[in-house]
Amino acid sequence: MVDKRESYTKEDLLASGRGELFGAKGPQLPAPNMLMMDRVVKMTETGGNFDKGYVEAELDINPDLWFFGCHFIGDPVMPGCLGLDAMWQLVGFYLGWLGGEGKGRALGVGEVKFTGQVLPTAKKVTYRIHFKRIVNRRLIMGLADGEVLVDGRLIYTANDLKVGLFQDTSAF
């Protein structure tokens, strides 16, 4: 049985990356450096824009984060694809939180818009995931819209984020 808490610490997220949080058959978050959040501050089965589930997570920003040193030299900015990946990570994490089993894989996104950036001078990135639908059949899949905010200002939106849980990924 999954320990369904409303919030998770960095240690909890690292445990997920080791396959310890949702059990041996549950989905895992990536390990650092690809783990793109420091904590989950809220998870609910209701709420969000569609009242079908909501996740909010945060990443603390500091100038020493790995991506600022290489993207770009002399013009450091967090790659937008990392914010998108964080949203996919959270959709998969939510599926595990619901008790879903399998290996998480991003399946797509309908539309992404970038209207701002994360610079090394920022303090905090907030991710908000609004679930639209959960498919719990042979394929377990989450469909959600997401938002990325930096220091409280909306900078990315993603519609129709899709993540599936697979028992076998060898033919994927």
Swiss-Prot record:
Keywords: Cytoplasm, Fatty acid biosynthesis, Fatty acid metabolism, Isomerase, Lipid biosynthesis, Lipid metabolism, Lyase
Pathway(s) annotated for this protein in UniProt: Lipid metabolism; fatty acid biosynthesis
Reaction equation(s) it catalyzes: a (3R)-hydroxyacyl-[ACP] = a (2E)-enoyl-[ACP] + H2O; (3R)-hydroxydecanoyl-[ACP] = (2E)-decenoyl-[ACP] + H2O; (2E)-decenoyl-[ACP] = (3Z)-decenoyl-[ACP]
Active site residues of this protein: 71
Superkingdom classification of source: Bacteria
Localisation per UniProt entry: Cytoplasm
MF GO annotations: (3R)-hydroxyacyl-[acyl-carrier-protein] dehydratase activity; trans-2-decenoyl-acyl-carrier-protein isomerase activity
InterPro entries for the chain: FabA, FabA_FabZ, HotDog_dom_sf
Pfam family, one: FabA
Family membership noted in the UniProt record: Belongs to the thioester dehydratase family. FabA subfamily.
Entry function: Necessary for the introduction of cis unsaturation into fatty acids. Catalyzes the dehydration of (3R)-3-hydroxydecanoyl-ACP to E-(2)-decenoyl-ACP and then its isomerization to Z-(3)-decenoyl-ACP. Can catalyze the dehydratase reaction for beta-hydroxyacyl-ACPs with saturated chain lengths up to 16:0, being most active on intermediate chain length.
Assembly and oligomerization: Homodimer.
NCBIfam families with a match to the protein in the record: fabA (TIGR01749), PRK05174.1 (NF003509)
UniProt cross-references to PANTHER family, sorted A to Z: 3-HYDROXYACYL-[ACYL-CARRIER-PROTEIN] DEHYDRATASE, 3-HYDROXYDECANOYL-[ACYL-CARRIER-PROTEIN] DEHYDRATASE
Protein name: 3-hydroxydecanoyl-[acyl-carrier-protein] dehydratase
Organism: Escherichia coli O6:H1 (strain CFT073 / ATCC 700928 / UPEC)
Source species taxonomy: Bacteria, Pseudomonadati, Pseudomonadota, Gammaproteobacteria, Enterobacterales
